[in-house]
Structures are given as C-alpha cells and as structure tokens.
C-alpha cells in the first residue's frame, strides 16, 4: 500500500502527514532566513476588500454590506497612503463602549456613513442591514494596474433617489497615480 493511503487510513490524517512533511524539511527550514513577502495586491472576494500598492501609493477599499461584524455604514469607503503616510483617510473606529453593541450604535458618528468618505445623497446616509450593500463589485489586477468597481447605490434607502453610483478606484502602477472616478445616475 502507498504511504499516502497509510496516512489516510491511520485516522491521524491530515495531522500526521503535515507533521512528517515538516520534519523532513526541518534542516532546510532551520537554515532559511525568514523574509516578509511584499504584497502589491490583495483581493478578499468574500469581504469585497481590495488592497493595492506600488511602493509609494497604497489604496485600500471596500464593498460589502452594512450588516458585517462590527459594522459601519461605509460601503465604498477607502483609504490612501503615500510613502507610508496618510493621504486620504477614513474616520475609522472609535473606542468601543456599550453603545457600540446596542441598538443605538448608528447614533455614534464613527459608525455612520456621514463620517466616512462616502456621499450623503439627497440628504440620506447609507442604512444598516444586509440589504444595504455594494453591487456589481469587480476587481481587476494586472502588473500595471489594480482596479475596483463598486455600485454603492443599494447601500442607500429608496428616498435617496439614486439609481446607480459606481465608484471606480484605480492604482496605476506605471503612471504612479491613483484615480477615483464616480459614475452617477439619479432616479
């Protein structure tokens, strides 16, 4: 019988297989200097989060919905840094209090869309709940650019009278620039 079948039938699979593999590599692992990999682009599809950089610029942006764990009403928000320093920021989180986890959480400024870099449309902020979300979210990565598109219109109540609000965030690595373009269609 093959060794892989023995591991599978032993009841210790996959643990013992991983341990044996690591033990067989121990000498190589001990003599290898750890190096932090440099990530120029990351896309977390389930969370609809993009992080893209080129050594100078870094952009992080999110789609998602307004019912996520520790939610803020911030679909379409982003932050930008240049040479490791904030260039365009998002207010972010405040100190957690009992109000943070109560039905009054959206009275707190840092949880409201008004205090994030998303628009207030016709006087309306984004609403909380899973039905308030980014749609038609897309991410494209090439060696020269990273692009995220998110339509944030569904993050707002009907009263905002917005049909489509597509936010396009681009890091152009070749031209060393970031662009944010808004495509807006009102009802």
Where are these regions (language model features)?
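Acidic, contiguous internal or C-terminal segments within carbohydrate-active enzymes
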Residues: 148-187
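Catalytic core of carbohydrate-active enzymes
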Residues: 59-142
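Catalytic cores of secreted or luminal carbohydrate-active enzymes
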Residues: 11-32, 86, 111-150, 155-158
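Residue-level marker for the onset of beta-strands and adjacent loop->beta junctions
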Residues: 48, 76, 115, 146, ...
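Carbohydrate-active enzyme catalytic cores, enriched for enzymes
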Residues: 1-87, 141-143
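Short, ordered beta-strand-loop transition motifs
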Residues: 43-46, 138-147, 170-175
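A generic beta-sheet turn/junction motif
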Residues: 54, 82, 91, 114, ...
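Hydrophobic side chains in beta-strands
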Residues: 54, 63, 80-82, 121, ...
């Amino acid at each position: 019988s093959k060794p892989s079948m023995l591991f599978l039938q032993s009841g210790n699979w996959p643990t013992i297989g991983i341990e044996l593999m690591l033990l067989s590599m121990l000498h190589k692992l001990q003599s290898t200097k750890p190096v932090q990999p440099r990530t120029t682009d990351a896309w977390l599809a389930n969370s609809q989060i993009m992080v893209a950089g080129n050594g100078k610029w870094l952009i992080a942006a999110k789609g998602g919905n307004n019912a996520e764990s520790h939610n803020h009403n911030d679909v379409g928000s982003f932050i930008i840094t240049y040479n490791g320093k904030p260039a365009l920021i998002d207010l972010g989180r405040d100190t957690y209090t009992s109000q943070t986890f109560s039905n009054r959480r959206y009275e707190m400024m840092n949880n409201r869309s008004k205090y994030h870099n998303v628009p207030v449309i016709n006087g309306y902020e984004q609403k909380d709940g899973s039905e308030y979300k980014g749609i038609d979210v897309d991410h494209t990565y090439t060696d020269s650019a990273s692009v995220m598109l998110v339509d944030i219109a569904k993050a707002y109540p009907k009263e905002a009278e917005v049909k489509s609000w597509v936010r396009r965030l681009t890091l152009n690595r070749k031209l060393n620039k970031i662009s944010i373009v808004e495509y807006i269609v009102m009802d």
